[in-house]
């Protein structure tokens, strides 16, 4: 990550993943705990020329980094096709920190938020505004 005001996701420390994931948020009814699920379709981290094992996902921004070790690969016909990572928070402060990262990441990538049209009872989706 070159710029101090930018946010990036890394599977290998120091190497930004250029593929933008689909991110889904779920929270408990009281809002204290929850998860963000990241799905990367055809990420560069799975490219054949990539060397090394994926030991986690780092979300890096001007405040530091958030880390999850919950990263799983998806294979189709024996070939890697996607990565799914889950970041879990256990306090409102952790959630607020994650959302600050998410806002910076969205700004860096030119993204916005949208509501999920499905019926996820007990789940909150990030929304504009």
Swiss-Prot record:
NCBIfam families: PS_II_psb28. Belongs to the Psb28 family. It is a peripheral membrane protein. Part of the photosystem II complex. It comes from the Bacteria. Keywords: Membrane, Photosynthesis, Photosystem II, Thylakoid. GO terms for cellular component: photosystem II oxygen evolving complex; plasma membrane-derived thylakoid membrane. Transmembrane segments: none annotated. It is found in: Cellular thylakoid membrane. The gene is psb28. Residues 110-129 are annotated as: Disordered. Pfam families: Psb28 (PF03912). This is Photosystem II reaction center Psb28 protein. The keyword Transferase does not apply. One of its GO terms (biological process) is photosynthesis.
């Amino acid at each position: 990550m070159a710029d101090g005001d930018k946010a990036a996701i890394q599977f290998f420390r120091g190497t930004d993943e250029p593929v933008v994931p689909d991110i889904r948020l779920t929270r408990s009814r009281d809002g204290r705990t929850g998860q963000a699920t990241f799905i990367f379709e055809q990420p560069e981290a799975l490219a054949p020329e990539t060397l090394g094992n994926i030991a986690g996902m780092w979300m890096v921004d001007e405040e530091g980094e958030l880390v999850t070790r919950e990263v799983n690969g998806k294979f189709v016909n024996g070939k890697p096709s996607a990565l799914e990572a889950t970041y879990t928070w256990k306090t409102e402060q952790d959630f607020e920190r994650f959302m600050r990262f998410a806002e910076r990441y969205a700004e860096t990538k030119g993204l916005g938020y949208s509501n999920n049209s499905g019926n996820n009872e007990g789940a909150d989706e990030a929304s504009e505004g």
